[in-house]
């Protein structure tokens, strides 16, 4: 049997064989959405006399709520079946994403959703920024649960508080030396002598004048000199004692020099 004219967009029942209809019906049972109508055998004795007919347009099977399918190249054929309905919060799984069970979690992702880690060569430029001096390596941020990363951070990252504590311990170890070592005692010994308070040039000059007039001062004169020079009586007394010892030494050296 044959039909004349173009057969595009037309269904010619005479070109289809109905011998295997019972076999196909047994393999693919009819569903509720598309019931298979039983075709009586008496209605199709010969279909050559019937003209070709066209079906009316059917309603759309897929609703408009389906998510957009990413555009693909028309050169390569990509067979795919019907996709399930996607929720509003679900993510598309692209070819450059790999699902990992222990990937790093991000705040923008839902808590119960699946996480995807980037491939190692996704950002080659950023790997050079993290050098060995930072204490962090690129794989540490790719794999591992959040708890493992928190436990791993104190081991790899140096803390300023830890460095300060180590420095204080080192100083304490230096201070705690052997007390029986005389060298250590001499190094850490502190002088108990009071800081020396030198006299000014004006005070020294006035004391020298007073010493030329009298090598020994009375109590009243010592009080008057201390009040004029803004000194204490003890300071004036000590200065005169030292000056007398110096004069005695100078006289002795002079006598020895004359005798020699």
Curated annotation (Swiss-Prot):
Q: What is its main location?
A: nucleus
* Modified residues annotated as Phosphoserine in this record: 159
Q: Name one GO biological process term.
A: embryonic skeletal system development
Alphabetical UniProt keywords: Developmental protein, DNA-binding, Homeobox, Nucleus, Phosphoprotein, Transcription, Transcription regulation
Per UniProt, subcellular location reads as: Nucleus
Region of interest: Disordered: 120-182
**Segments forming a coiled coil:** none
Is-annotated flag, keyword DNA-binding?
yes
Function, as annotated, reads: Sequence-specific transcription factor which is part of a developmental regulatory system that provides cells with specific positional identities on the anterior-posterior axis.
What is the protein's name according to its record? Homeobox protein Hox-C9
Gene source species: Mus musculus
Which lineage? Answer: Eukaryota, Metazoa, Chordata, Craniata, Vertebrata
């Amino acid at each position: 049997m044959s039909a004349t004219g173009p057969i595009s967009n037309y269904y010619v029942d005479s070109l289809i064989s109905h011998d295997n209809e019972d076999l196909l019906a047994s393999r693919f049972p009819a569903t509720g959405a598309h019931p298979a109508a039983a075709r009586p055998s008496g209605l199709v004795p010969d279909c050559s006399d019937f003209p070709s007919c066209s079906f009316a347009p059917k309603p759309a099977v897929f609703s408009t709520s389906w998510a957009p399918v990413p555009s693909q190249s028309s050169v390569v054929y990509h067979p795919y079946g019907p996709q399930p309905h996607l929720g509003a919060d679900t993510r598309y799984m692209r070819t450059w994403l790999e699902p990992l069970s222990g990937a790093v979690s991000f705040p923008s992702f839902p808590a119960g959703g699946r996480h995807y880690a980037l491939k190692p060569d996704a950002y080659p430029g950023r790997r050079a920024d993290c050098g060995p001096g930072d204490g962090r390596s690129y794989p540490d941020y790719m794999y591992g649960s959040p708890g493992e990363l928190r436990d791993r951070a104190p081991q790899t990252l140096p803390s300023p508080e830890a460095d300060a504590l180590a420095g204080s311990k080192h100083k304490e170890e230096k201070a705690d030396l052997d007390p029986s070592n005389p060298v250590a005692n001499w190094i850490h010994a502190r002088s108990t002598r009071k800081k020396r308070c030198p006299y000014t040039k004006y005070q020294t000059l006035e004391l020298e004048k007073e010493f030329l007039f009298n090598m020994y001062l009375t109590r009243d004169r010592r009080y008057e000199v201390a009040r004029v020079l803004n000194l204490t009586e003890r300071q004036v007394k000590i200065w005169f004692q030292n000056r007398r010892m110096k004069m005695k030494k100078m006289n002795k050296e002079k006598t020895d020099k004359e005798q020699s």
